Amino acid sequence: MRIAISTGGGDAPGLNAVIRAVVLSAHYRGWKSYGIQRGYEGLLSFNGVVPLGLAEVRGITHLGGTILGTTNHGNPFRYVMRNEQGEAYEQDRSDDLVAAFQASGFDALVSIGGDGSLQISHDLWRKGLPVVCVPKTIDNDVSGTERTFGFDTAVSTATEAIDKLHSTAESHDRVMVVELMGRYAGWIALYSGLSGSADVILLPEIPFDIEKVCDKIRRREAAGRHFSIVVVAEGARPKDGSIELLERRGVGTVDRLGGIASKVARAIEHHTGKETRSLVLGHLQRGGSPTTYDRLLALRFGSAAVRAIADRAFGTMVGLTGSDISRVALENVVGRAWNVPLNCDTIRTARDLGISLGD
């Protein structure tokens, strides 16, 4: 058995742990493993297939990033090409990818990725490519699994940043607005905001009223608390407003969210007169060594993916259900983002602690 491994989309702490688990689990079954570099680019645009043995994955569990590299621009169904004038256009090269996969003599693919990669894998599976998926995103927004690796590390990083903002905000009697990743799901903002004792948490799932946000800050001021911490998810939006974008979808790309923290900070300063600063934590949330939880989850996902291949359970994704690793059909995963339920215990906890959610 020859299996290929690919990592697509944004990087997340724990990717290397998955790769190591797949390679080791395959090795002890007598199988050979190969890595496709930079997502599917290693099959489509250059000779990027590398053997992965015990030596190649030794000592990588604790490393952030991915030893295979990754990209957000390698969708074979929307592959970016350029004409003679240098203008970019999209072309469907999925058949080329399947042909290259077969020509390489692979028997199965372990695709590690988020919602975009899962959609690609589903469409490739429908073309006959034998694939098993491992969910990967710091956003924790993939349906079919209660947790994705990378999320715990991102929350830890964000919480540490919020902790540090408290001292500078209090020293200057300022309002600090920190923008966190998550795209259209507020998991990172909710978990880190709650853990970091934020005063306001703004989520994509709950459109906010800026006056409600300012009212919370005024009440703290009246109580002698002359600083406030506002945590805002990048996909949060005001009532009757739109999501802030840094860049709209172009050829081979998706919308880039961002800018809401600056907008909220300006509004707070205008309505309250309080000196307000904004901070975008950005890609720090993707970096660093994975937490113990993320390492363990990634290792479990990787070994479960190999077991799925052994059972020829292609067209599935491994996921966490309760305390067990399960398999979910890709057709029941794609196009079904998992957002924060409005009645979940964590939301209720935030409200019970007096945290404003802007509504």
Which ranges hold each PLM region?
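A cross-family phosphate/adenosyl-ligand binding-site feature
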Residues: 1-8, 16-105, 112, 116, ...
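Short beta-strand segments
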Residues: 6-7, 36-37, 69-70, 111-113, ...
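Short glycine/serine/threonine-rich phosphate/pyrophosphate-binding segments
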Residues: 12-22, 43-44, 76, 91-95, ...
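Short, acidic/small-residue loops that bind anionic groups at enzyme active sites
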Residues: 29-30, 34-37, 124-148, 152-155, ...
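Accessory alpha-helical/coil subdomains and C-terminal extensions
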Residues: 99-100, 108-113, 119-123, 151-172, ...
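Glycine- and acidic-rich phosphate- and metal-coordinating loops
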Residues: 277-285
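Flexible loop/turn connectors
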Residues: 298-310
